[in-house]
Amino acid sequence: MTPSLANFLWSLVAGAVVLGALFGAIIFVSQRDKVRRR
């Protein structure tokens, strides 16, 4: 595995983690909003 390939894979992993956290936060907030509105 070349260093550039390793860096590319790590950037993919970091991007997936950031996207996952973002979607998790959006879903969490939307669930809370639903409860508060009712």
Curated annotation (Swiss-Prot):
Keywords for the protein's UniProt record, in alphabetical order: Membrane, Photosynthesis, Photosystem II, Thylakoid, Transmembrane, Transmembrane helix
GO biological process, one term: photosynthesis
Coiled coil: none
Membrane topology: Single-pass membrane protein
Protein location: Cellular thylakoid membrane
GO cellular component, one term: photosystem II
Spans through the membrane: 8-28
Main location: membrane
Function as written in the Swiss-Prot or TrEMBL entry: Involved in the binding and/or turnover of quinones at the Q(B) site of photosystem II (PSII). PSII is a light-driven water plastoquinone oxidoreductase, using light energy to abstract electrons from H(2)O, generating a proton gradient subsequently used for ATP formation.
Family indicated by similarity: Belongs to the PsbX family. Type 1 subfamily.
HAMAP family: PSII_PsbX_1
Description of how the protein assembles with itself and partners: PSII is composed of 1 copy each of membrane proteins PsbA, PsbB, PsbC, PsbD, PsbE, PsbF, PsbH, PsbI, PsbJ, PsbK, PsbL, PsbM, PsbT, PsbX, PsbY, PsbZ, Psb30/Ycf12, peripheral proteins PsbO, CyanoQ (PsbQ), PsbU, PsbV and a large number of cofactors. It forms dimeric complexes.
Name listed for the protein in its UniProt record: Photosystem II reaction center protein X
Gene that this sequence comes from: psbX
